[in-house]
Each structure stands twice: as C-alpha cells, then as structure tokens.
C-alpha cells in the first residue's frame, strides 16, 4: 500500500520526534527544514521540546550536514553541524534568499519541514507558549514557504499554537492554519512530482 501524505498540527513540539523516526524509517536520514525562534537542539539526555533535534541527529534520523534552521532568535552555541540562518539574516536578506539557501542545503534529499508558530514575530502570532520578538511577518513566512516549491518534502508539521494565549480575532490560529495549508500544498506538490498519489 502506498504511503499517504501527512501533516501534523499540534500544540506541542514533542510530537516531532516520533514523526521523524517514522519518516526516516521509510526514507532514510532526513534533511530537516526547521523554521523556529528556538533551536530545539540543546545537548541533554532528556527528551523534551528543547532537545528534540539533538536526539534526532544523534540517532541518525536527521542528516545535519543537509539540514537548516531559519529564524532562530535564541541561539544555541552547539550547532551540531546544522546550517543556521538567524532572524537577523532572514530579515536582512529576505524570504526569497532564505528559500534559495534552504534549497541549496537540502538539494533533492527527502526533507521534513517543521514550522513552530513562534517563528513569526509575536505581533503576528501572540498565541504561543514561548514568543520571541524580532521575527518575520506572516507574509514573509508565506513567501519563504512558497519559495520551497520543488523541495522533496516527505512530511511536515506546524506546532505550538496555544489558543489560550491568542489575541482577539484569533490571529495566531489564522496564521497557523494558513501556514499549515501552505505546508500541505508543498507536501502534495512534492508527492505529485515523485509520481505518488496526492
């Protein structure tokens, strides 16, 4: 039976580890495209939202040499071999340049895209547990995502929308739903380009 497309939409970032494990079992080590204010790659034996990608790299689920983190505003000195484009780089160079850099790092390898809603500046997504000022707008995030057409995405997620913290008008939920739809579009497009059922 052919594998189906999967986009995970969750409040907590800890859902990513089992998803990475499942996708890596099918496709081999993944190129990670991680859009977030936080690196989530701190070195620790604990498995939690701050160590997820450290463990994924250490266990061979993620190929760090062909993976990239974008929008980071709480830097971690331990890069574990990941390419890092911090928020200053993103805002100076723009979303199109970031998309091109992602494409050059990932190449044609199977890729997993994860977007933490705190990637956005809290002016556009206040409803999250750990907001950090200085991020991109919703439109800049969409421009970056749509610049990833042709990347071999095999899965993805959009995490950390916390409705209890959202502003009047549910702007975080709207941003999260819109970006999740964009990611799903990219996964479907990649499946079609591979000749898989969409």
Where does each model-flagged region fall?
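Conserved alpha-helical scaffold segments that buttress catalytic/binding sites
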Residues: 1-198
